[in-house]
Amino acid sequence: FGLDPVYCVRINPLGPGCPAPPKHGAPRMPGPAKYDEIEPTLFPDNAPLMDDLREHLRTHDRESFVLWAVVDGFFWFPRRLFGIEEHFYAFFDYPELMHRMNAGLAEHSMEMLRQVGEIATPDFVTFAEDMSYNHGPMLSEGMFAEFVEPYHRRVVPVIDQIGSIAICDSDGDVTEMIPWLERTGTRGGLPLERQAGVDGMAIRRAHPEFVMIGHYDKMVMNRGEEAIRAEFERLLPLMRSGRFVPSVDHQTPPGVSLEQYRVYLRLLRKYAELRVK
């Protein structure tokens, strides 16, 4: 399709021996007391990941691809262990354990990112968080300040030191939490879901320096060329404002045909050219 290749370095804090949840969203540990048992399976050295990156660089010119590094965020990681429902109770029932988990994650993320930075400079680094849904954040600003912010503040300077930028990957409407992120040094967000009510131009007016990736409403892609074009028209002022990479907000839906996707790509290239004129 002529798109820029992307190489993603996914730094997983769960080692191969970490127990799998019995179903999606279920706990990986039967109870908080079991954390001592599973902790030795966490925070692996990820040596194969680093070896794969070195091999890729041996066979590819660095300027020929986008390098994207991903670390677990400090809302997301405890949820992977506690399970979705139990995680929300844990903020109140097990705050000390939450901090212990996130302190360990922060140390692991910093070490892994330093290793990546010694091999190559990522174009950007995302915190996998998913802290929002279509009505905004799933935690209060106070909870963010207590359980998430201190650990972002530890990791972001390392991201800066290796020459990259920190971006928060969160589903839903992140608008309310952008000031929270900015004060940690996190400089952008993705995928800025249009279906969740995100308004990119409103974000740009309130946060002129905020980096944005995504925000193209994927739900119009099977509605014909005019609908696809109209969505690019909506985004053109944001594209011209800078610090914005338009892309499908999440994956292209399965109902989009190959021909419809080609129309999307043709118009993406056209509007990218219009952006600089």
Indicate where each model-derived feature is located.
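Active-site loop segments of alpha/beta catalytic cores
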Residues: 39-277
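A contiguous, low-structure linker/loop signature
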Residues: 2-49, 59-68
